[in-house]
Amino acid sequence: MNLHEYQAKQLFAEFGLPIPEGYACDTPQEAFEAAGRISTAKKVVKCQVHAGGRGKAGGVELHDTKEGVKEFAQKWLGKNLVTYQTDANGQPVTKILVEEASNIANELYLGAVVDRATRKVVFMASTEGGVEIEKVAEETPELIHKAAIDPLVGPQAYQGRELAFKLGLQGDQIKQFVKIFMGLGEMFTQYDLALLEINPLVITGEGNLLCLDGKINIDSNALYRQPKLREMHDPSQEDKREAHAAQWELNYVALDGNVGCMVNGAGLAMGTMDIVNLHGGKPANFLDVGGGATKERVAEAFKIILSDDNVKAVLVNIFGGIVRCDMIAEGIIGAVKEVGVSVPVVVRLEGTNADLGRKVLAESGLDIIAAESLTDAAQKVVAAAEGK
């Protein structure tokens, strides 16, 4: 689960990290009043969406007057912001962050992520702030400095000092950096984060450190024990189909193809998408119904797939291990009858009760195309999607 910038900064403040004075606003009038409370001559106004590239898309501006701030809010609130990280429809803007402009002398990068290779939280720091860390890693990897956090003892002050030295910080800046580093380390584990970034972490003209931007991603598997963070969830930033799928414990990712896919198991789902591509098709989604699929979940999966108007055919690929193929077949039949499927449906069943599942489908009287193998299924669904 992602957080907005203003929410990330709320957590930063909770751990004593330095942030600019700012206010999250829901209406143009609130933005106007917030601008009046900020003492700096210039105000920064930012659209709050779960995507990067806001500045280049016009979603971040600098204004001298309260009226300018209000006009910006009027322009964007209720609209969609399209950036290079969104799809063509963009992300809806429901909040505007109004904050004081900062006197920036230098920009740094500080982030943390779970490193699966070392099984530790790894902090990354760089003097190349304000740009994408992926670009820095590709072009100048020697400018990224790392510190791995031992899960038994947590972040240590000496690690923060080492990073500060490598960033060229001096005097009181080192103390400030260590405080930020220690606070982020505590926050990462306490709130079950998967990723956090401060980009940029700036050095102001007065020589102080300031968290100018914030990005936080929370491990969704841990949300059950993070009620405070659950309340920060913004469903407006999610694909409606993905949000619906999550309610039914379905793993769904919308894509831009025309072949709907329903599979049990993430690996098989990825393999199914690959073989559809191999035979000239384009998957419309990734959908894993999981090992504990029920008839109800299968029916909901069908509804979600068919809610995409681009879907011209559906491929159901089930390997019966934990889940029984006959139960999946009953779910398919129920969904087809309930939803009124008007596109071709290709079904490949293998494993537990596969023969019984195929028999159930054959006796249903529905126009369902049976496939003997994965290759056969891919060829048939691609042909069906093309109207052949």
From Swiss-Prot:
EC code(s) of this entry: 6.2.1.5
Q: How is the cofactor bound?
A: Binds 1 Mg(2+) ion per subunit.
| Any one of the GO CC terms | cytosol
Which positions does UniProt annotate for substrate binding? 264, 321-323
GO MF assignments: ATP binding; magnesium ion binding; succinate-CoA ligase (ADP-forming) activity; succinate-CoA ligase (GDP-forming) activity
Instruction: Tell me the route in metabolism or biology where this protein functions.
Output: Carbohydrate metabolism; tricarboxylic acid cycle; succinate from succinyl-CoA (ligase route): step 1/1
Swiss-Prot/TrEMBL cofactor(s): Mg(2+)
Q: Does the keyword Ligase apply?
A: yes
- UniProt-listed GO biological process terms: succinyl-CoA metabolic process; tricarboxylic acid cycle
Summarize where Mg(2+) binds, as residue positions.
199, 213
ATP-grasp domain boundaries: 9-244
Pfam families (alphabetical): ATP-grasp_2, Ligase_CoA
Q: Which UniProt keywords apply?
A: ATP-binding, Ligase, Magnesium, Metal-binding, Nucleotide-binding, Tricarboxylic acid cycle
Q: Which SUPFAM superfamilies match?
A: Glutathione synthetase ATP-binding domain-like, Succinyl-CoA synthetase domains
The keyword ATP-binding is assigned to this record: yes
Where, in this chain's numbering, is ATP bound? Answer: 46, 53-55, 99, 102, 107
Substrates-to-products reaction catalysed: succinate + ATP + CoA = succinyl-CoA + ADP + phosphate; GTP + succinate + CoA = succinyl-CoA + GDP + phosphate
Q: How does it assemble?
A: Heterotetramer of two alpha and two beta subunits.
Describe its function. Succinyl-CoA synthetase functions in the citric acid cycle (TCA), coupling the hydrolysis of succinyl-CoA to the synthesis of either ATP or GTP and thus represents the only step of substrate-level phosphorylation in the TCA. The beta subunit provides nucleotide specificity of the enzyme and binds the substrate succinate, while the binding sites for coenzyme A and phosphate are found in the alpha subunit.
Q: What does the sequence similarity comment in the record state about its family?
A: Belongs to the succinate/malate CoA ligase beta subunit family.
Q: Mind telling me what this protein is named?
A: Succinate--CoA ligase [ADP-forming] subunit beta
Q: Which organism is it from?
A: Vibrio vulnificus (strain YJ016)
In the UniProt record, what gene is named as encoding this protein? sucC
